[in-house]
Design a protein with these regions (language model features):
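Non-catalytic terminal and connector segments of soluble metabolic enzymes
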Residues: 1-248
C-alpha cells in the first residue's frame, strides 16, 4: 500500500452523546464534522443503546474514580432521559481520512466545556456544561463534564474504541483499518465467561466462518484456554451484544 493510501485510511471514533441528542444538536455536530469542513468521510455509523458492559469498557481508564458511576449513567442516557428509557442512545460514527484523529479533536475543542468556551469559542464542546456530582448524603464530590461528543484522543485509542464499538462487517471491506480473520471456532458468552459449546442462555459471539478482528479472535482463543490476555473478554463481546437487550 502506498504511503498516501496508508495516511488516508486513518480512522477515529465519534460518539454523539445523550446531552447533544436531548438538545437537538445532532445536525449541528454532523455539519461541523462534514467532509466539506474536515476532508473526512463516514466509514460506519450506528444508533446504539449503550449497555452497562459497553459503557464500562469504553470508560475503563476511569474505573475507581469518584465520577465513574455518574459517567456511566451519562453515556447510557439515564441522566438526560430518566423516565424515557426508549430514548437512551448515542450515535456512534467512524470517520476516515488524513489526520482523522487530530482533525476531529480540533473541531471538538477541549474536554472541559468551560475551558472550551474560554480557549476555543465556537467549538462543539463550548456548548456543553459542567454538572455537580454529590454522594448519597449530598456532599459535593466534584464535577462531571457533559461535553456533547466523544472523539478518540490518539490513534491507539481509536483502534481500541473502534474495535469496542464496531464489528468488521459494520464497515465496508475496503475501509477496514485493521487486520481481520475468519473464525475457526465457536465462541459463546454467558455471565462473564466464554464457552466453545452452546447451552441455554449462552450468546454466540462468533461462529466458525464468521469474520472478526484478528486481535479479537486471538484474545478469545487465549481467554478460552485460560491464558492471560491484554484484552478483557468484555471488550471483545460488548459490540456483539449491542442492541440485543434493553436495559432499564
Amino acid at each position: 500500500m502506498e504511503q498516501t493510501e496508508q495516511n488516508d485510511i486513518e480512522q477515529t471514533l465519534v460518539l454523539i452523546k445523550p446531552d447533544a441528542l436531548k438538545n437537538s444538536l445532532t445536525g449541528y455536530v454532523l455539519s461541523q464534522l462534514s467532509e466539506f469542513h474536515t476532508g473526512l468521510r463516514f466509514a460506519a455509523t450506528k444508533i446504539v443503546h449503550v449497555s452497562s458492559m459497553l459503557a464500562g469498557e469504553h470508560y475503563a481508564e476511569h474505573r475507581g474514580k469518584f465520577f465513574f458511576a455518574s459517567l456511566l449513567d451519562y453515556i447510557q442516557g439515564r441522566l438526560h432521559y430518566p423516565k424515557e428509557p426508549w430514548k437512551r442512545r448515542v450515535i456512534a460514527i467512524i470517520y476516515q481520512g488524513p489526520k482523522a484523529v487530530s482533525r476531529v479533536r480540533e473541531l471538538c475543542g477541549p474536554t472541559n466545556p468551560h475551558k472550551a468556551r474560554d480557549e476555543k469559542p465556537g467549538c462543539i464542546r463550548s456548548l456543553g456544561t459542567l454538572e455537580i456530582i454529590k454522594d448519597a448524603s449530598g456532599k459535593v464530590l466534584g464535577e462531571r463534564m457533559d461535553n456533547l461528543i466523544h472523539a478518540s484522543a490518539n490513534t491507539a485509542d481509536a483502534e481500541r474504541e473502534l474495535k469496542l464499538w464496531f464489528k468488521p462487517n459494520d464497515i465496508p471491506p475496503a475501509m477496514h483499518p485493521y487486520a481481520t480473520e475468519v473464525s475457526k471456532s465457536n465462541y459463546y458468552f454467558k455471565d462473564g465467561k466464554l464457552y466453545d459449546t452452546y447451552d441455554a442462555g449462552r450468546f454466540c459471539v462468533l461462529a466458525t466462518g464468521d469474520l472478526g478482528w484478528k486481535s479479537d479472535i486471538e484474545a478469545l482463543g487465549r481467554l478460552l484456554r485460560g491464558e492471560p490476555s491484554a484484552v478483557p473478554v468484555e471488550s471483545v463481546v460488548a459490540k456483539y451484544l449491542i442492541n440485543e437487550h434493553q436495559e432499564d
